[in-house]
A protein has these predicted regions:
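N-terminal capping/small domains of soluble enzymes
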Residues: 1-123, 134
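Glycine-rich phosphate/ribose-binding loops and adjacent secondary-structure elements
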Residues: 126-211
Length: 211
């Protein structure tokens, strides 16, 4: 993130991607935070907002801005070491999310301002932008929110990689994260996970060509 005041440096070229509290338990989220810190890596909030203990145990922590905005809090964004704008996911490219009602506990429901025990569905696109020009404005908005102190990262699902990466690069983020089909999800239909997306390695080649 050379465009920001406090770029993130990792000891290893791997970090723990966004997995929401709800999809994962409190114990899993905090354990992953501790493990990432021990490994010199980072973790990400995923959808649904911030767990204070995850932030406490993560030396380097991304806060995710996702389509639904469930749990998104500007004050929590200012506590992050980086902001990740979720645009797509490798195993369900172009689709929204689905959290089963049995995982929407009282605590999860409170964080997301939703009724407990009811299935939660996320839309496929963000409500406040429709294309590349709007995305560039969103990146700038997040820079202003964080006072340009932390990197802004765009997360893309690997599909039309060449075109998508060219579009994302024009929005002037600090980094572009390409998610391949290998990444698992419990928030999409099996038919999409089994039959869509491309491998991350193949996507990297197209991303390099785009840049």
């Amino acid at each position: 993130g050379p465009r920001c005041e406090n770029p993130i440096e990792l000891d290893i070229p791997v970090y723990i991607t966004g997995m929401s509290f709800g999809a994962l338990s409190y114990e899993a989220k905090t354990a992953l935070a501790r493990g990432a810190t021990m490994a010199g890596s980072a973790t990400c909030s995923g959808e649904g907002g911030m767990i204070p203990d995850e932030r406490r145990y993560s030396e380097k922590w991304f806060y995710q801005c996702i389509q639904s905005r469930y749990g998104f809090n500007p004050h929590h964004a200012q506590l992050a070491d980086g902001i990740e704008v979720f645009i797509g996911q490798g195993q369900k490219v172009g689709m929204g999310g689905h959290l089963m009602g049995q995982k929407v506990t009282d605590q999860v429901a409170e964080m997301r301002s939703l009724p407990a025990g009811i299935d939660q569905r996320s839309p496929a696109r963000h409500p406040d932008w429709l294309g590349p020009d709007d995305l560039a404005l969103k990146v700038q908005e997040l820079r202003e929110l964080t006072k340009n102190k932390v990197p802004i990262q765009l997360k893309l699902g690997a599909a039309k990689v060449y075109d998508d990466v060219r579009m994302a690069a024009k929005c002037d983020p600090d980094s572009i994260y390409l998610d391949g089909m290998e990444g698992s999800t419990g928030a999409g239909p099996h038919i999409a996970a089994a039959n869509t997306g491309i491998p991350g390695i193949a996507g990297i080649r197209e991303a390099r060509r785009a840049l």
